[in-house]
Amino acid sequence: WMYVGGAPRTGYWWRDHFDEAYVARTRHSGQAVRHQLQLTSNEYGGLVKISHWGHNFKELVPPAKYANDHPEYFALYKEQRTTSGDLGLCLTHPDVAAIAAQSMRTWMREDPGADQFFIGQPDSGKRCQCLKCNQAYEKYSRVNSIPAMRGSSADLAIHGGFAGVLLQFANEIANKVEQDFPNNKIGIFLYESSLIAPKNITKVHKNLLMWFCAAGWTSGSGI
């Protein structure tokens, strides 16, 4: 299977998992399959439709709209507010959750048939380093709870601090949109910087669905 796309990557793509019966049996009938081959017919249960799936912070709070007048909405990283590349947000700024919730409401109105909507952190690890965010990381941190990992993964997540900030951000969004869309589900990535479970969060909103990905974990130890 030859891959042809806009960005360089391996020349061959493993395709066995795009068989409809296999996809249905392994419960992989979600957005990744939808993007690739549009498989999984109604005979096999159809696709799970996820609106705005992926690393979508730039869609939740568009830098083209807000960066010039409100650089404080974006991550303070290495003493600079960054809006380029794989964007981070200042998740503790109260305006950011409100803007993201408004974006989410717009998506829900525009795509009423979606099974889930999404909050997707970036791959970059560009967590905001402002004073308020750092204080929140400390609040949610589990200093002694890092599991067995390999390589650079041992430095992830400020021991659960970022996961706590991200979940609180997602809770705020879910609470705000529930007024208009009480039954809509919102997916959220938990991986890399948000992989370690935080302390001091006892409950997440009933409409939040956790996408847990143990990337970088050794297979020799339990989750």
Locations of the language-model features?
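Substrate-binding cleft/loops of secretory-pathway carbohydrate-active enzymes
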Residues: G187-S219
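Extracellular/periplasmic catalytic domains that process cell-envelope and extracellular macromolecules
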Residues: D111-P112, F181, I201-H205
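Short conserved micro-motifs at the rims of enzyme active sites and ligand-binding pockets
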Residues: S221-I223
